[in-house]
Amino acid sequence: MIVPLVPKLAIVASSGAADPTRASIPFHIAANGAAASGVETLIILAGDATELLRDGVAAGVQGVGIPPLAALLEKCAEAKIPIHV
């Protein structure tokens, strides 16, 4: 029996609000790239990245050339992308 493989991606993020572009890129890849392409995706936060989920932090994070982190988190929630801390 051939079982079709479902592409899966785990993204590990460790950058926090001090580096807004690096902090936002994992969420951008997950929401606008992988999940939008049908790839089962999850995000794992470690180190400084864990601060991004604190109340009010995401609202102040705006990377260069990508959407604001708050919008990316909203899109991740809509796509039901799990975020593990």
Summary of predicted features, one role per range:
Residues S37-G38, K80:
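Glycine-centered short loops/turns at secondary-structure junctions
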Residues I2-V3, A35:
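Acidic, glycine/proline-rich low-complexity segments that act as flexible tails and inter-domain linkers
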Residues A23-A36, I43:
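Histidine-anchored nucleotide/phosphate-binding helix
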Residues T41-A46, I83-V85:
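Short internal beta-strands
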Residues A49-G63:
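N-terminal beta-loop-helix "entrance" segment that forms/cooperates
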